[in-house]
């Protein structure tokens, strides 16, 4: 689960992490009042959306008067911001964050993520702050410093000092930096975060480290332990189809392609998307229906996929382990009666009773449902049908 920058900074403040003073505005008048209250000579006006790259897209601007802050907020509020992390439609701006300007001496990057290969959290830092860390990793990988933290030991001052020395911090900065990292890691662990990212982390003219921007994402599976985090959820930032899928225990993520995918198991779902791309197509979604693949579940999956007007064909890829393929085949036919499936459906079933399942689909003789002989053949057929605009 993602939260907004202003919410992330409120959490950081609770853990003693330095942040600039600021306030949230939903109207231009509120933005003007907040700037007046903060005082100073310059303010940053930041669009609040769940996506990075706001600065390049015009979602972060500076104002030199409170009145200008209101004018900038007026232009941002209600507009749609398109960044490299949004869809082509972008995200509508409902709130802006008005923040005091700071005297900045140096910018850094600091982040905490789980390294699955090491099976432990890793703190990453870089002297190249304020830029896209993915670009730094691609173009200057040596500029990223990584320190793994054994969860059996936890974060210790020596971890912070190792990062500080690698960043070339001055002697008087090291202790401040270690304290900053200690607080950040405590938040990461106690709130069950997946990512805590400060970009940029700045050292100010007042000689302190401050989180100038912040991104925090949380583990959905741990949200039951954090009702205070759940209360921060902004449904307007999420795809309505993804919210609906969650209500039926379906894992759905909307993508930009035209081949709908319905698969059981997250690993198989990712492999299915890969083979669709390998065959020259583009997946329209990630959809994991789980282990059951019951008629109601399949029907709801079809319904959600077909809400995307870009979908021109659907590839159903089910591996029958515990669930029998013949039951899945009957479930697909029952689902087709419940939901009007307006595009061709290619079905690949493998595993327990796969032969019987293929016979069931072939005997049903439904014009737009095709039994695929293999994973490769199914993906190729789905891509071909999608390229034909769904014509079977």
Curated annotation (Swiss-Prot):
Residues 9-244 form the ATP-grasp domain. ATP binds at residues 46, 53-55, 99, 102, 107. SUPFAM superfamilies: Glutathione synthetase ATP-binding domain-like, Succinyl-CoA synthetase domains. Keywords: ATP-binding, Ligase, Magnesium, Metal-binding, Nucleotide-binding, Tricarboxylic acid cycle. GO terms for molecular function: ATP binding; magnesium ion binding; succinate-CoA ligase (ADP-forming) activity; succinate-CoA ligase (GDP-forming) activity. GO terms for biological process: succinyl-CoA metabolic process; tricarboxylic acid cycle. Its EC number is 6.2.1.5. Heterotetramer of two alpha and two beta subunits. It catalyses: succinate + ATP + CoA = succinyl-CoA + ADP + phosphate; GTP + succinate + CoA = succinyl-CoA + GDP + phosphate. Gene3D superfamilies: ATP-grasp fold, A domain, ATP-grasp fold, B domain, Succinyl-CoA synthetase domains. It is an enzyme of class 6 (ligase). This is Succinate--CoA ligase [ADP-forming] subunit beta. It comes from the Bacteria. Coiled coil: none annotated. Transmembrane segments: none annotated. Pathway: Carbohydrate metabolism; tricarboxylic acid cycle; succinate from succinyl-CoA (ligase route): step 1/1. Its cofactor is Mg(2+). GO terms for cellular component: cytosol; succinate-CoA ligase complex. PROSITE patterns: ATP_GRASP (PS50975), SUCCINYL_COA_LIG_3 (PS01217).
């Amino acid at each position: 689960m993602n939260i907004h920058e202003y919410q992330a900074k409120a959490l950081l403040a609770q853990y003693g992490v330095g942040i600039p003073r600021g306030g949230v505005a939903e109207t231009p008048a509120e933005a003007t009042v907040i700037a007046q209250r903060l005082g100073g000579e310059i303010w940053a006006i930041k669009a609040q959306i769940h996506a990075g790259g706001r600065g390049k897209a015009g979602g972060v601007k500076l104002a030199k008067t409170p009145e200008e802050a209101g004018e900038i907020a007026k232009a941002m509020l209600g507009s749609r911001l398109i960044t490299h992390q949004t869809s082509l439609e972008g995200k509508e701006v409902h709130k802006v964050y008005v923040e005091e300007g700071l005297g900045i001496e140096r910018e850094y990057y600091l982040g905490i993520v789980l390294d699955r290969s090491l099976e432990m959290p890793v703190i990453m830092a870089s002297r190249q702050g304020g830029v896209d860390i993915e670009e730094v990793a691609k173009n200057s990988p040596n500029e990223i410093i990584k320190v793994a933290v054994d969860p059996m030991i936890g974060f210790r001052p020596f971890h912070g000092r190792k990062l500080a020395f690698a960043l070339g911090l001055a002697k008087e900065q090291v202790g401040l930096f270690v304290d900053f990292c200690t607080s950040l890691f405590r938040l990461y662990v106690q709130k069950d975060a997946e990512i805590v990212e400060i970009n940029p982390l700045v050292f100010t003219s007042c000689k302190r480290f401050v989180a100038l921007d912040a991104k925090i994402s949380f583990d959905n599976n741990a949200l039951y332990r954090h009702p205070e985090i759940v209360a921060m959820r902004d449904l307007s930032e999420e795809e309505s189809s993804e919210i609906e899928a969650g209500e039926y225990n379906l894992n759905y993520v909307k993508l930009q392609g035209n081949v709908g995918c319905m698969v059981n198991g997250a690993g198989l779902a990712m492999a299915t998307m890969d083979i669709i791309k390998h065959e020259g197509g583009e997946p329209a979604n990630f959809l994991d229906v789980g282990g059951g693949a019951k008629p109601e579940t399949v029907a709801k999956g079809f319904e959600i996929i077909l809400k995307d007007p870009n979908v021109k064909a659907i590839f159903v890829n089910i591996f029958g382990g515990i669930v029998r393929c013949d039951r899945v085949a009957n479930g697909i036919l029952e689902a087709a009666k419940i939901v009007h499936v307006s595009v061709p459906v290619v079905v690949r079933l493998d595993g327990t009773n796969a032969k019987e399942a293929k016979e069931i689909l072939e005997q049903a003789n439904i014009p737009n449902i095709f039994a695929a002989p293999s994973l490769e053949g199914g993906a190729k057929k789905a891509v071909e049908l999608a390229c034909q605009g769904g014509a079977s």
